[in-house]
């Protein structure tokens, strides 16, 4: 079992700009080489701005290259709850932003000829309790009326047409969702930035930032750059201004990839061929790959990714995979990895300005499509275009007890596992 991301291991190599070419001044510095930063850098070049992207390690080496491979539309939580919490108009508007984000990814793939197995496969959100069924039905009715007439509610034997499993009693199909190879997309996006004239420097962290007349002085180990504008797209990074770190809770998400299987086997286990997300408090998500592997992930451990946690999580995920898909043959796990999700208190992303510095982050597990979309929107804002940020004006509270919060994550995880156990005892 390789303790590395399948996406990163099987992505093509990428050659960044030589360190000697670090310029003295540019229109924009983008900090962070994930999908947000790369998308912003490409859009900035399209709008005529000179741009340097600084990445502490390797492009798409963190969350962008360590996720489950889904490009899903729909909110992270319940649409019905969002309507009650923020009002129907705001919830509907946000839902449509997520839809537009999936469209944006597809457009970027097409316009830049990125070979990444992009496919509109749809998402299936499944429940195994009567409470789940009621919640899915409520969301279905609300979505049909307000935001997405394409969603479809299924139950009973209809489930078996999607999954060969007796575990689930209901599901909601989101046809607009997609999937792709994250590593190949990320490298293709980075190559597109370079081809457009942008500069990318890997292993080049931002070590300081000072505001000055007409812009910002950004420090790196390889020199300083003056930029008219700076975009922070750093997600769960432990570095950079503390204002951002105090508002992000890094939560580990862990994933395994099986060895390749016979295509017929996967089709029998997952005849619907969709991205699948479960509704348990400790939920799982899974999908097939173009080379007939099963990618299966979840919050197996409520701690940050590291070697010991990744190994333990891999064994837990294998057990969960067998419970969830009992028809799956005794297949081996070839890859196991973890990554950190940049959670906000309400699981909604944030984008705007702080002390003149632009930012976009906090995608809370729904980052693939939103990071690409928001990278473009923030690039447009940095270029002087108005009304481009759909997340403008949203307050961003600190994580309560930020310094201690990570120590309580295992307790939170134990609570939700116990809650799942009790709920599963229902008749």
Which residues does each predicted region cover?
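C-terminal catalytic lobe of FAD-dependent flavoproteins
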Residues: 302-308, 314-425
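N-terminal Rossmann-like FAD-binding beta1-loop-alpha1 element of flavoenzymes
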Residues: 26-53
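Glycine-rich FAD pyrophosphate-binding loop
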Residues: 46-66
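Glycine-rich active-site loop/strand segments that organize a redox cofactor
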Residues: 66-96
């Amino acid at each position: 079992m390789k303790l590395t991301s399948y996406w990163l291991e099987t992505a093509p190599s990428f050659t960044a700009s030589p360190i000697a070419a670090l310029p003295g001044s540019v229109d924009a510095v983008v900090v962070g080489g994930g999908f947000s930063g790369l998308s912003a850098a490409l859009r900035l070049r399209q709008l005529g701005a000179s741009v340097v992207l600084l990445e502490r390690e390797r492009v798409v080496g963190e969350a962008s290259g360590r996720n489950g491979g889904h490009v899903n539309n729909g909110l992270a939580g319940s649409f019905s709850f969002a309507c009650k919490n923020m009002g129907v108009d705001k919830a509907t508007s946000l839902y449509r932003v997520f839809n537009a984000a999936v469209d944006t990814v597809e457009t970027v793939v097409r316009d830049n000829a990125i070979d990444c197995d992009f496919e509109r496969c749809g998402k299936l959100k499944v429940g195994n309790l009567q409470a789940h069924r009621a919640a899915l039905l409520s969301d279905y009715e609300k979505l049909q009326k307000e935001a997405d007439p394409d969603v479809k509610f299924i139950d009973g034997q209809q489930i078996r047409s999607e999954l060969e499993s007796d575990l689930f009693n209901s599901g909601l199909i989101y046809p607009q969702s997609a999937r792709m190879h994250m590593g190949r997309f990320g490298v293709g996006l980075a190559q597109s930035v370079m081809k457009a004239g942008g500069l990318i420097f890997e292993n080049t962290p931002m070590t300081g930032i000072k505001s000055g007349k007409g812009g910002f002085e950004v420090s790196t180990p390889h020199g300083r750059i003056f930029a008219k504008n700076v975009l922070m797209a750093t997600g769960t990074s432990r570095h950079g201004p503390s204002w951002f770190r105090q508002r992000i809770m890094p939560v580990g998400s862990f994933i395994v990839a099986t060895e390749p299987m016979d295509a017929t086997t996967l089709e029998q286990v997952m005849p619907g061929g969709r991205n699948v997300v479960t509704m348990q408090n400790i939920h799982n998500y899974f999908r097939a790959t173009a080379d007939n592997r099963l990618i299966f992930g979840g919050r197996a451990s409520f701690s940050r990714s590291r070697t010991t946690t990744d190994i333990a999580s891999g064994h837990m995920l294998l057990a969960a995979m067998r419970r969830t898909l009992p028809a799956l043959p005794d297949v081996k796990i070839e890859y196991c990895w973890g990554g950190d999700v940049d959670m906000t208190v309400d699981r909604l992303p944030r984008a705007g300005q702080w002390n003149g510095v632009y930012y976009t982050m906090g995608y809370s597990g729904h980052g693939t499509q939103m990071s690409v979309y928001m990278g473009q929107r923030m690039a447009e804002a940095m270029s002087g275009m108005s009304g481009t940020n759909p997340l403008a004006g949203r307050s961003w509270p600190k994580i309560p007890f930020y310094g201690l919060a990570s120590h309580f994550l295992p307790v939170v995880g134990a609570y939700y596992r116990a809650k799942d156990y009790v709920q599963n005892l229902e008749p």
